[in-house]
């Protein structure tokens, strides 16, 4: 469970941020630095969100039941899912580069504990111009590329399915309230409020299309934190059952991070400390 969004301010500043949710105590995360690439990763540096010196930002998101990886290829570069983000950040300057490189890659299976299967992943890519694309491994190890005009992202199902659902939902949603209603906010009646990826995508689409565009870099970061606050998950409200122990496993927002592509600053807050900090 994760939610991501890009905002472009009037002064041209591009900021992109995300929440990260995962089963409690399953994965740990820390600051990542590799040359000119900075971000947040697992201690081994494999599950990475990061930005390079060109302002290219790549986020990895969970893609359960939909990621389809291939067998080793003789004609393409074989790469593991946990290697994709760092490889692209090392090789590409912008979305155009990523699109070209993606055609040369064959994403193959790997063993990566604590996952019992190859980690199912897809990727959100944003560059300094504000262009955004999605990479999804939908068959035979090939990465399918989708343009992402709203710069929003969650998890499964596929990106085209999300966009179709969002398009239909937005036809019936508005920021304008009924003037005769007893409460403000009636224009958004029907906006889904649950934590499923499909519902979160629709909420992101609504925010993307209705928020007041910030004027400055600082305003863009501030606005994006306000939006992502709506996707923050406190421990207890989302849970599953561990089939081996019978105990609840909780999902919570481990961290929220924002990359300011103009200033190259990275700011974040985590579950136990809601104060915004520089990475």
Swiss-Prot record:
Record has Hydrolase as a keyword: yes
MF term (GO), any: hydrolase activity
Keyword line: Hydrolase
This protein's record includes keyword Hydrolase: yes
InterPro entries per record: CBAH/NAAA_C, Ntn_hydrolases_N, Peptidase_C59
Pfam family name, one: CBAH
Family of this protein: Belongs to the peptidase C59 family.
Listed name of the protein: Uncharacterized protein A284L
Organismal lineage: Viruses, Varidnaviria, Bamfordvirae, Nucleocytoviricota, Megaviricetes
């Amino acid at each position: 469970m994760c939610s991501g969004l890009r905002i472009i301010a009037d002064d041209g500043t591009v900021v992109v941020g995300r929440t990260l949710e995962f089963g409690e105590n399953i994965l740990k995360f820390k600051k990542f630095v590799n040359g000119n690439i900075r971000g947040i990763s697992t201690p081994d540096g494999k599950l990475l969100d990061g930005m390079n010196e060109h302002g290219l930002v790549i986020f990895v998101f969970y893609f359960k039941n939909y990621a389809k990886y291939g067998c080793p290829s003789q004609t393409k570069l074989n790469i593991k899912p946990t290697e994709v983000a760092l490889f692209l950040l090392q090789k590409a300057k912008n979305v155009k580069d990523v699109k070209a490189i993606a055609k040369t890659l064959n994403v193959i299976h790997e063993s990566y504990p604590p996952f019992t299967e190859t980690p199912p992943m897809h990727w959100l890519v944003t560059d300094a111009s504000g262009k955004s694309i999605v990479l999804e491994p939908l068959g035979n190890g090939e990465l399918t590329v989708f343009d992402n005009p709203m710069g929003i992202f969650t998890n499964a199902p596929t990106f085209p399915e999300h966009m179709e659902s969002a398009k239909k939902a937005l036809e019936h949603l508005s920021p304008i309230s009924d003037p005769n209603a007893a409460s403000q906010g009636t224009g958004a009646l029907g906006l889904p409020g649950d934590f499923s990826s499909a519902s979160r995508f629709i909420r992101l689409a609504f925010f993307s299309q209705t928020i007041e565009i910030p004027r400055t870099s600082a305003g863009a970061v501030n606005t994006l934190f306000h939006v992502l606050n709506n996707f923050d998950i406190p421990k207890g409200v989302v849970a599953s059952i561990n089939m081996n122990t019978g105990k609840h496993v909780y999902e919570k927002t481990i961290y929220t991070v924002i990359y300011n592509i103009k200033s190259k600053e990275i700011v974040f807050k985590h579950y136990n400390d809601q104060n915004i900090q520089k990475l």
